[in-house]
A protein has these predicted regions:
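Alpha-helical multipass membrane-protein architecture
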Residues: 1-463
Length: 463
């Protein structure tokens, strides 16, 4: 797909066709984006940002339920490129978890006894942000970790032939000397990988000597390598993305007995892990393949990555300094940080202090249930010959209705209305239309942020 996009944009005639579909979406996103983002910048929001909260209105009938819809166009139009079967499974899972699951964890005596902290912290009238943060930390985080582990195991099992083929190809390449006209020698690449990864483990152990060194060694050299193989193999065979489950390192640390850690080490071991490869391997391999298909040297791609990393790091430092001079982070000056950063801080604090209820039994149970449900969904899809996928199960587990509802609405509009109305023309144009909408809204958001920074620049602190 990436190579096709490059070829498309390189063709003058086809580029004009793309622009014909791109610009209507761009203008729609630009106009809506200005209405959405400039209002808060000027002090009188016309549309609630980032979502419309219905939780307070439904708390009497469904206590603890997370109910709301995003006001950004991103999940709405993004759903247009998601197959209807996947979005339907995602919506059903999201409602089952974040609406009915949250409610039952408060009202059902048996479930209430399993999550006493959630029952103690909830109160009538709690807004959506607090309900989402508290329920994720007190109820769903251990379940999500176990489910991610189970789903990762299922994906590896499903694509075991591709992963095995990758291993055989790597072995044969090493045996034959590796390398090629456009790629560096494989032995050199492997030596660089092992050296840098081992150096990361050595630095980690030097800074945290009281933590068992076997854990970072296994995670970096074994698990990271296997995850990289799996990610590249799965992307190459199916195009589907795959990465290590979230909080994998945190879970391993949580379950590892290390009584001699100092308070500083007890915190640092969670938030400063060694290098664990695999999360970006699939995307990187896909980019290199697209470069080869379009006649681009892979070495040039690596140079661009290095330059972009260095430039991005410099810009990030300068931007962070400027933002902190304008206002504290998090604060009302940066609305999204008020939603996201407290939840992240709570999760870090509860992990470090062992305040979460994470047990091998809970992880194994949620992993087993996830594997069973995913296998049942895949079997049902093959039996009924409908396009449902177990990936929707994971999307719904990690996506509250704020985004799951708009995603399903966009997918239904695309599949049931626009495709029937415009036929193949819509299939050819939808990606470009969606890109145009996101481009327009992104430009409006950028202008709004710049305007907000200029308006608040008078807050600059003297240091």
């Amino acid at each position: 797909v990436d190579a096709a996009v490059v070829e498309l944009l390189s063709s003058g005639e086809r580029f004009r066709e793309v622009v014909r579909y791109l610009m209507p979406g761009f203008y729609l996103g630009l106009v809506y984006g200005f209405i959405l983002y400039l209002g808060p910048s000027l002090g009188f929001p016309l549309i609630p940002l980032p979502f419309i909260d219905f939780t307070r209105f439904t708390s009497a009938a469904l206590p603890g339920a997370v109910i709301g819809v995003a006001t950004s166009l991103m999940p709405w139009v993004g759903g247009m490129v998601v197959p209807l079967g996947i979005s339907a499974v995602a919506l059903a899972t999201s409602l089952a978890v974040w609406v009915f699951g949250n409610c039952l964890a408060l009202t059902n005596p048996a479930l209430r006894s399993l999550f006493p902290e959630w029952a103690a912290e909830y109160y009538q009238g709690m807004d959506l942000t607090r309900v989402l943060q508290r329920s994720q930390v007190r109820v769903w985080l251990p379940v999500q970790i176990g489910a991610a582990l189970g789903f990762a195991a299922l994906v590896l099992l499903k694509y075991r032939r591709a992963v095995a083929a990758t291993g055989r190809a790597l072995y044969l390449s090493l045996k034959g000397g590796g390398g090629g006209s456009s790629l560096p020698p494989l032995r050199l690449a492997l030596a660089c990988y092992l050296a840098s990864t081992s150096a990361s483990v050595a630095v980690f152990h030097y800074l945290m000597p009281h933590f068992p060194v076997a854990v970072p060694l296994v995670m970096s050299l074994l698990v990271g390598t296997l995850m990289g193989f799996a990610s590249a193999s799965i992307v190459g065979e199916s195009g589907a993305g795959f990465s290590a489950p979230g909080f994998l390192w945190h879970t391993i640390v949580y379950l590892t007995p290390a009584p001699n850690l100092t308070p500083q080490e007890a915190y640092s071991v969670f938030v400063y892990p060694p290098v664990i490869a695999g999360s970006m391997t699939g995307g990187g391999a896909q980019t290199i393949k697209a470069a080869l298909l379009t006649g681009t040297k892979p070495s040039d791609v690596v140079k661009v990555w290095v330059i972009a990393f260095l430039a991005g790091t410099l810009v990030n430092f300068l931007s962070l300094d400027m933002f902190w001079r304008i206002a504290p982070i998090p604060s009302s000056a940066y609305p999204s940080t008020v939603v996201s950063m407290p939840a992240t801080a709570m999760i870090d604090a509860l992990l470090v202090t062992r305040g979460l209820r994470i047990s091998p039994q809970m992880l194994a149970g949620s992993a087993a249930v996830t594997v069973a449900l995913a296998a049942a969904i895949e079997a049902l899809g093959r039996l009924l010959k409908v396009g449902v996928s177990a990936s929707g199960l994971m999307i719904g587990l990690f996506s509250p209705p704020i985004t799951a509802i708009p995603m399903f609405a966009g997918s239904a509009l695309s599949s049931l209305v626009l495709r029937r109305r415009f036929g193949e023309r819509w299939d050819q144009a939808k990606n470009v239309v969606v890109a145009g909408v996101l481009l327009g809204e992104g430009l409006a958001a950028t202008v709004a942020v710049i305007s907000l920074m200029l308006l608040k620049a008078v807050w600059l602190w003297p240091w």
